[in-house]
Amino acid sequence: MKSSVRIASLDDAETITILINSAFRIAEGFFIEEDRINLEGVQNYFTTGRFLVTAIDDIPAACVYIEPRGERAYLGLLSVEPARQHNGLGKLLMDAAEEFCRELGCRFMDLNVVNLREELFGFYGRRGYVETGTSPFPADVVTKLPCHFIDMSKLLTT
């Protein structure tokens, strides 16, 4: 089983949409009723940032969105195909995203975690991310439970 990380192209948008929705359906189905994102939404992300894709034997199995913003970068939509979760793909992709942004001159990586996804605080905390505040959950997303984001950040050391 050979894995590789690459920068996604707009041609990958449909595959990325399916990957994100399958991962988030499992993880967030208890509080979100709809798909996490549609094809147009993924395509719009390509105008402001990039997706990295991890492929196993040339088949996309995980993706993450990164958006460099000067000395800071934003990371979001970390998604691993449900059947491949808990096998280190998320860590591999996080390492690649952090290195990519570091090479662009970013000093910090920022991300948001839904407060209801408590298991993610440990995952990101072990990777050096610390809580920096809160922000509102998008008002246009229908949720079954009230929720908000916990903002987290990490210094990208050299």
At which residue positions do the language-model features occur?
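A short helix-loop-beta-strand connector motif used in the catalytic cores of GNAT acetyltransferases and
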Residues: 43-53, 62, 74
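Conserved GNAT-fold acetyl-CoA-binding loop/helix
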Residues: 17-47
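Conserved acyl-CoA
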Residues: 92-108
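Conserved beta-strand in the GNAT
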Residues: 59-67, 74-79
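C-terminal "cap" of GNAT-fold acetyltransferases
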Residues: 43, 51, 107-110, 114-121, ...
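A short beta-loop-alpha structural element at the N-terminal edge
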Residues: 4-16
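Glycine-rich acyl-CoA binding loop
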Residues: 75-76, 86-97
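A short, internal acetyl-CoA/4′-phosphopantetheine-binding micro-motif in the GNAT/acyltransferase core
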Residues: 78-85, 113-114
